[in-house]
Amino acid sequence: EGDGLLMAMEAGAQLGNMSHAYWMQSALEFKPQHRDAKPNYMLGSDERARPGAILVNRKGQRFVNEAANYNAIGKSLHAFDAGTHSYANLPYWLIIDQRYRDRYPTFNTPAGGPVPSYMIEGATLEELAEKAGIDPAGLAATVARFNEMVRGGHDDDFQRGDNSYDNFYMWGDTSYDPPFRTLGAIDQGPFFAVQMESGALGTAGGPKTNANAQVLDWNGDVIPGLYAAGNAMDAVLGEAYGGAGGTLGPGMTFGFIAGRHLGTHIPNR
């Protein structure tokens, strides 16, 4: 809940990287029958990368390689449109068809399961778009182009399926050969949409440190006796992300560095 950050600020720590996080795609499930219940945040890491799924913005347009890593996709969500003073890709939607639902689970719904409350259904793409608040013509054109590229075996727009990450990481369907582990047509109605949001696995900001994991003040001087490591420090990779577990290495490394330095610099009493 940010206790470490608050304590560091009270000690006069210099902060860095505060506008960045380890981004993740998420969807919300509301259960109105539970009056005091908070919404259920569902991570959307693999649904988007399977064959027969795309992500679109309110114009019905794709804006990213859906099989890319979740942090990179998260960055694409924060593109600001100065003309409309809005985020061009927020909100956004996962678009799938009945074939997808029959074959794959979707968030907390098993394959072939009933349509959940958070999923919008339409007999046609145009009907789906109207219900979801997406531009109908834009969505229809996007799906038509995507299906054409699938038939050609290549995503000319975002190169989805071109690299090893797209095809051999955990998100795709390994029962197919590349690039069809992640590329599949959306052409068997009814069609479905899930509104998505920008989520995060953790923050990348915190107090700045030196090579000894000592926290620095706003003049760049060491704050005596104060150390930081892991997610409690300004991330060593800045706004970059090394992948799953990418925060554990810095946590262990700088925890060790802090302990070693502290052990050899204990003031005489």
For the regions a protein language model found, what residue spans apply to each?
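Glycine-rich loop(s) and the adjacent beta-strand/alpha-helix scaffold that form part
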Residues: E1-K31, D81, L248, I257
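A conserved FAD-binding loop/helix module that cradles the flavin
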Residues: E1-M7, M233-I266
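Phosphate/diphosphate-binding loops
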Residues: H34-L77
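Short beta-alpha connecting loops at secondary-structure transitions
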Residues: R35-Y41, T109-P114, E239-T247
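Short, small/polar residue-rich loop motifs at catalytic or cofactor-binding pockets
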Residues: R48-R50, L201-T203, A244
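Gly/Pro-rich active-site capping loops and adjacent beta-alpha segments
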Residues: Q61-Y92, D217, V222-G238
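N-terminal leader/propeptide and maturation segments of large enzyme subunits in energy/redox metabolism
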Residues: P91-Q98, Y104-D156
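A glycine-rich dinucleotide-binding beta-alpha-beta segment and adjacent secondary-structure elements
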Residues: G138-V236, A240
